[in-house]
């Protein structure tokens, strides 16, 4: 932690984002969890990831800075957790139509203002996004992973990008 700012500045010099000599660089990885508060395993997964990094994979941390954002949407998560605690069945009801799986509006997916933060990256209208983008741009990580859940009947696949890339995507990215 003592060298964190030095590492960050070195990384920005290597990327060409700020002036300075290019030198040895560590990989910067940013992990975002729980942008949809009702994707409930996400924040717990962030804690497991942090634990595993410091107990099982410490060698990775010699060459990598890992930034963990454990809960991008704390308002939505809090709303979902309160809903679930009030409505869960004991024993748990796995029927998709049971009340514990049917949140009322304004559900945990959105922030306090009923805004889906996962739709705010381009427009940056929400305070949470503004602050996160500022910090993200302070680091410009090599890798960003945005963790989500998916429904059992709605899998999805995002193919890797192909050329030509958009003009605002730099060679460094």
Predicted regions and their residues:
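Active-site/substrate-binding loop(s) of hydrolase catalytic cores
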Residues: 3-32, 40-173
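Conserved phosphate/anionic-ligand binding catalytic regions in large, soluble enzymes, centered on
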Residues: 36
């Amino acid at each position: 932690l003592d060298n964190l700012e030095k590492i960050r500045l070195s990384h920005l010099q290597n990327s060409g984002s700020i002036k300075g000599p290019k030198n040895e660089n560590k990989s910067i990885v940013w992990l975002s969890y729980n942008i949809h508060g009702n994707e409930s395993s996400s924040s717990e997964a962030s804690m497991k990831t942090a634990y595993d990094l410091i107990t099982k994979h410490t060698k990775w941390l010699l060459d990598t800075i890992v930034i963990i954002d454990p809960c991008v949407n704390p308002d939505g998560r809090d709303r979902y957790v309160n809903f679930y605690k009030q409505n869960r069945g004991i024993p748990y009801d796995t029927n998709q139509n049971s009340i514990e799986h049917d949140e009322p509006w304004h559900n945990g997916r959105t922030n306090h203002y009923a805004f889906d933060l996962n739709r705010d990256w381009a427009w940056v209208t929400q305070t949470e996004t503004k602050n996160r983008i500022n910090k993200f741009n302070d680091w410009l990580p090599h890798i960003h992973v945005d963790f989500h859940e998916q429904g059992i009947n709605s899998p999805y696949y995002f193919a890797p990008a192909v050329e030509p890339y958009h003009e605002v995507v730099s060679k460094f990215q």
